């Protein structure tokens, strides 16, 4: 039996996890992750592909913020699919419906770049604030008219949580959860409150300030694997899209001008 043809595999190599998404008829029909490990071997990645990707692809597009793993994935993909993947980055030329770098190119992570492109290309918004809560918390603004406006980068919730546990002698490991109240009475509850309310106020504060700064309305899109516990606290209308980054990588991969 011939394997069904799925034309595109998108890979997002992040600091904490590596996301894989296959697209068929412009829709994601498979989304899986593996933990990022700087010591990953060729045979481990090949076994993961064999277990999860029993299909053919025409193209593989990759965004990577862990360059040490790029060679392994390039070799495995060639061994498995017999094709060479395309790595997207901010400094390539793309045929998009808007100019991301209207005021000139500047260094930007490929994952952040993908988020911002997807926010404009996949939605009918003119101005968007994009929040990605992963290993890092990135908050960037983008405009269809003016391109990428800039942003903020902070450590993500789990980084802050683990740093606190590592440096506070009496704090013991416990599960994080969405706080029930702003003011909690137990140590674990207070840590949860402090952890998530700081991001609530950061996101809502930046959102209010950029509206004043640019005198324009902005839509809010939230992405990232660590966002789900924060979402109930956000009091601004938003769209949550867990697949925003892979959607952006796919758009960029198909828009590269050679």
From Swiss-Prot:
- Can you tell me which residues bind substrate? 94, 109-112, 187
EC id: 2.7.1.33
Q: Give binding positions for ATP.
A: 12-19, 135
One family from Pfam that matches here is Pan_kinase
The entry's localization annotation reads: Cytoplasm
Q: Which residues form a coiled coil?
A: none
Which residues does the Swiss-Prot or TrEMBL record annotate as the active site? 111 (proton acceptor)
Which residues of the sequence carry a binding annotation for K(+)?
Answer: 132
The biological pathway it contributes to is: Cofactor biosynthesis; coenzyme A biosynthesis; CoA from (R)-pantothenate: step 1/5
Listed under GO cellular component are: cytoplasm
> InterPro entries annotated for this entry?
ATPase_NBD (IPR043129), Type_III_PanK (IPR004619)
Q: Which domain of life is it from?
A: Bacteria
What does the Swiss-Prot or TrEMBL cofactor note state? A monovalent cation. Ammonium or potassium.
Q: What does this protein need as cofactor? A: NH4(+); K(+)
Catalyzed chemical reaction(s): (R)-pantothenate + ATP = (R)-4'-phosphopantothenate + ADP + H(+)
Protein keywords:
ATP-binding, Coenzyme A biosynthesis, Cytoplasm, Kinase, Metal-binding, Nucleotide-binding, Potassium, Transferase
The family database entries (NCBIfam families) matched by this protein are listed as:
baf (TIGR00671), PRK13326.1 (NF009863)
- Family, similarity comment: Belongs to the type III pantothenate kinase family.
Function per UniProt: Catalyzes the phosphorylation of pantothenate (Pan), the first step in CoA biosynthesis.
Checking HAMAP family in the record gives: Pantothen_kinase_3
Subunit structure, as described in the record? Homodimer.
Question: Which named protein is this?
Answer: Type III pantothenate kinase
Gene name in the database record: coaX
């Amino acid at each position: 039996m011939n394997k069904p043809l799925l034309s595109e595999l998108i890979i997002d190599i992040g600091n904490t996890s590596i996301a894989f998404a296959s697209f068929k008829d412009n829709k994601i029909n498979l989304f899986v992750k593996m933990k990022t490990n700087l010591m990953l071997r060729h045979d481990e990645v090949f076994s993961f592909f064999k277990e999860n990707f029993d299909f053919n692809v025409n193209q593989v597009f990759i965004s990577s913020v862990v360059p040490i793993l790029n060679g392994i994935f390039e070799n495995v993909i060639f061994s498995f699919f017999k094709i060479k993947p395309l790595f997207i980055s901010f400094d390539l030329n793309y045929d998009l419906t808007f100019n991301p770098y209207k005021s000139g190119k500047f260094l930007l992570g490929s994952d952040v770049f993908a988020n911002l492109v997807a926010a404009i290309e996949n939605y009918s918004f003119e101005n968007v604030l994009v929040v990605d809560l992963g290993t890092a918390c990135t908050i960037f603004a983008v405009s269809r008219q003016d391109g990428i406006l800039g942003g903020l980068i902070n450590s993500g919730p789990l980084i802050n949580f683990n740093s606190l546990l590592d440096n506070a002698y009496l704090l013991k490991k416990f599960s994080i959860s969405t706080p029930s109240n702003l003011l909690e009475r137990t140590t674990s509850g207070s840590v949860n409150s402090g952890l998530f309310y700081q991001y609530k106020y950061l996101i809502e504060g930046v959102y209010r300030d950029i509206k004043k700064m640019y005198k324009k309305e902005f839509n809010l899109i939230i992405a990232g694997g660590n966002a789900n516990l924060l979402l109930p606290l956000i009091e601004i209308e938003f769209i949550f899209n867990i697949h925003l980054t892979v959607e952006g990588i796919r758009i960029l991969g198909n828009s590269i001008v050679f």
